[in-house]
């Protein structure tokens, strides 16, 4: 469980480095599964075979790859088990102060050694227009030691209280990643009144939490080490479907506008119920890695 001090830090900054949540053997199992899924690619899965929703290069540059995989858990029992990690799910319930937590989707972020590119500054919530309120907290689990040399995230503490500024962030050129915010003035009533770009290293097997409106991005991987991580995006029991929005996960949502996302079905499993982490589904308790 997180301490009151940690919860207060997250409330103030919109980001928090958490504890170790998976062991070295578990990390290696997930790495092996990631290699298997990437080797298959978007077109390598047989008809009817469980597969991710999407595999893509976020950088759009084959020489500066940033691999993104959405819902790898649907293709891998090992990654599906991670969704139910009680240290993570209990922390999400604490940080949101909500008794019921559901998975929105997961997102692998993989920067290969020596050439993994920049992921520009952004906020998560504006890219999820099918949800209201936006999913509030993401758990980001490192599968390698992540630091500035291999493309760790950078955060702007306090920015989650400034509102939606995705248009401003999208205008920041990639080559000026480390110059963000020189021309930005936070709201006059904001608790934090300056753009303070902060490197965000995370140890292998540890988790980092960030709010869906916190400004964040990541630099190039210039090291000889890969930078592998998975973001677990969660939503609370308050989340509602916005039919006018668009998102890769929308095709799995068979709901009327403004319906509770808690009714969205098997692609959005519940992981906390009435403040208590949900145990592993029976199908996962003895499921082998595929």
Please report, for each region that a protein language model flagged, where it lies by residue.
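Non-heme Fe(II)/2-oxoglutarate
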Residues: 40, 45-48, 61, 165-171, ...
């Amino acid at each position: 469980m997180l301490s009151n001090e940690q919860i207060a830090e997250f409330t103030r900054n919109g980001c928090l480095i958490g504890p170790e949540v998976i062991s070295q053997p578990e990390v290696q199992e997930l790495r092996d599964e990631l290699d298997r899924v990437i080797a298959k690619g978007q077109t390598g899965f047989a008809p009817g075979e469980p597969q991710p929703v999407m595999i893509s290069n976020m950088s759009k540059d084959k020489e500066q790859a940033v691999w993104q995989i959405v819902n790898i858990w649907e293709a891998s029992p090992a990654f599906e088990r991670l969704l139910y990690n009680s240290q993570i799910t209990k922390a999400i319930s604490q940080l949101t102060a909500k008794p019921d937590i559901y998975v929105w989707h997961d997102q692998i972020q993989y920067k290969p050694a020596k050439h993994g590119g920049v992921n520009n500054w952004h906020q998560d919530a504006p890219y999820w227009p099918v949800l209201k309120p936006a999913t509030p907290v993401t758990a980001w689990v490192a599968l390698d030691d992540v630091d500035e040399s291999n493309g760790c995230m950078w955060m702007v503490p306090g920015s989650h209280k400034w509102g939606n500024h995705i248009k401003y962030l999208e205008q920041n050129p990639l080559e000026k990643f480390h110059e963000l915010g020189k021309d930005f003035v936070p709201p006059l009533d904001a608790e934090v009144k300056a753009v303070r770009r902060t490197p965000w290293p995370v140890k292998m097997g540890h988790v980092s939490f960030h709010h869906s409106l916190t400004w964040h991005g990541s630099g190039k991987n210039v090291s000889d080490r890969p930078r592998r991580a998975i973001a677990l995006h969660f939503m609370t029991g308050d989340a509602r479907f916005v039919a006018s929005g668009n998102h890769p996960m929308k095709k799995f949502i068979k709901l009327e506008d403004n319906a509770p996302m808690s009714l969205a079905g098997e692609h959005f499993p519940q992981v906390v119920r009435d403040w208590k982490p949900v145990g592993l589904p029976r199908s996962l308790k003895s499921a082998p890695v595929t």
